[in-house]
Amino acid sequence: MKLIILDRDGVINQDRDDFVKSVDEWIPVEGSMDAVAFLTQAGYTVAVATNQSGIGRKYFTVQNLTEMHAKMHRLVRQAGGEINGIWFCPHTDADNCNCRKPKPGMIEDIIGRFNAQASETWLVGDSLRDLQAIDAVGGKPALVLTGKGKKTLSQHGHELPEHTQVFDTLLDFSQYIMQENAAPQAD
């Protein structure tokens, strides 16, 4: 099982300081729909793991979130891709749950659901907490510089998990993965 987990806000869609609260505010990052399509066509299972504390803070509802995800699914399919599952944590930090990144609960659940190997699983995110969550299970962290990525690199570059790879965008990450898949494997 080849699994790639994507954070949502700042990776797939544009992030907002005041939370993405509605389908109208959910705007894809340029190239992200094509990136998911490329990963799908390269044989990867693509899942989304997203902290959505705006639900816990009562900024938007699960229904609003469902509408945003329906739009994301539709646009990804139009590009020729597939998102195989979406996991979200509705809690705030104060709830001290195990599913909110950087804790690994959501990531462990996704890896278990798809019967994947953690050591072979990528997580692409724009925040330190995304990278810490995949690192906690022994996976492969990738930082994109969209969303909060540039700020993460400048403020937390020294804290990034070892072996974190940095890409400008999700599209750049997908092209890297496709090149890796095309490279001849050593015996």
From Swiss-Prot:
Pathway: Nucleotide-sugar biosynthesis; ADP-L-glycero-beta-D-manno-heptose biosynthesis; ADP-L-glycero-beta-D-manno-heptose from D-glycero-beta-D-manno-heptose 7-phosphate: step 2/4; Bacterial outer membrane biogenesis; LOS core biosynthesis
Residues reported in the UniProt entry to bind Mg(2+): D7, D9, D126
Catalytic activity annotation: D-glycero-beta-D-manno-heptose 1,7-bisphosphate + H2O = D-glycero-beta-D-manno-heptose 1-phosphate + phosphate
Marked site: Contributes to substrate recognition: R100
Keywords annotated in UniProt: Carbohydrate metabolism, Cytoplasm, Hydrolase, Magnesium, Metal-binding, Zinc
Entry's family note: Belongs to the GmhB family.
Site (Stabilizes the phosphoryl group): residue numbering on this chain: T50, K101
Active site: D7, D9
Superkingdom classification of source: Bacteria
Principal subcellular localisation of the protein: cytoplasm
Chain positions recorded as substrate binding sites: D7, R8, D9, D15, R16, D17, D18, F19, T50, N51, Q52, S53, R100, K101
Cellular component, GO annotation: cytoplasm
Complexes and interactors: Monomer.
The protein's Enzyme Commission number: 3.1.3.82
Record keyword Metal-binding present: yes
Protein name: D-glycero-beta-D-manno-heptose-1,7-bisphosphate 7-phosphatase
One of the GO biological process terms: ADP-L-glycero-beta-D-manno-heptose biosynthetic process
Organism of provenance: Neisseria meningitidis serogroup A / serotype 4A (strain DSM 15465 / Z2491)
Subcellular location field: Cytoplasm
NCBIfam families associated with the record: HAD-SF-IIIA, Histidinol-ppas, PRK08942.1
Any one Gene Ontology molecular-function term assigned to this protein's record: magnesium ion binding
Cofactors (names): Mg(2+); Zn(2+)
